[in-house]
Amino acid sequence: MSEYLILCSILFSLGAFGVLYRRNILVMFMCIELMLNSVNLLMVYFSALHNDQSGQVFVFFIMAVAAAEITIGLAILVMIFRHLGSINIDSLKKLKW
């Protein structure tokens, strides 16, 4: 049991570190997905541990919503890159009114 908890906490920590310390928006999206997938892995593990399938079904819905989120996020990212020529988070200050 502790191996899954350790793995998920390491993955979540790596994702949180990437979101906090990286300036590239694409890398930040990947780190957010890493955090989300670590929580999904933990939810699947606890669902299997308690012989309950509802947690595993819930993970499928989370993955579908995450796919839609990434699709919209990447579309916005492409438009930002076309407009500014950079996907650095600091370049978004140019979009202020």
UniProtKB/Swiss-Prot annotation:
The chain crosses the membrane at residues 1-21, 25-45, 57-77. The keyword Transmembrane helix applies. Keywords: Cell inner membrane, Cell membrane, Membrane, NAD, Quinone, Translocase, Transmembrane, Transmembrane helix, Transport. Its EC number is 7.1.1.-. It is found in: Cell inner membrane. It catalyses: a quinone + NADH + 5 H(+)(in) = a quinol + NAD(+) + 4 H(+)(out). One of its GO terms (molecular function) is NADH:ubiquinone reductase (non-electrogenic) activity. GO terms for biological process: ATP synthesis coupled electron transport. One of its GO terms (cellular component) is NADH dehydrogenase complex. It is a multi-pass membrane protein. NDH-1 shuttles electrons from NADH, via FMN and iron-sulfur (Fe-S) centers, to quinones in the respiratory chain. The immediate electron acceptor for the enzyme in this species is believed to be a menaquinone. Couples the redox reaction to proton translocation (for every two electrons transferred, four hydrogen ions are translocated across the cytoplasmic membrane), and thus conserves the redox energy in a proton gradient. PANTHER family: NADH DEHYDROGENASE SUBUNIT 4L-RELATED, NADH-UBIQUINONE OXIDOREDUCTASE SUBUNIT ND4L. Belongs to the complex I subunit 4L family. NDH-1 is composed of 14 different subunits. Subunits NuoA, H, J, K, L, M, N constitute the membrane sector of the complex. This is NADH-quinone oxidoreductase subunit K.
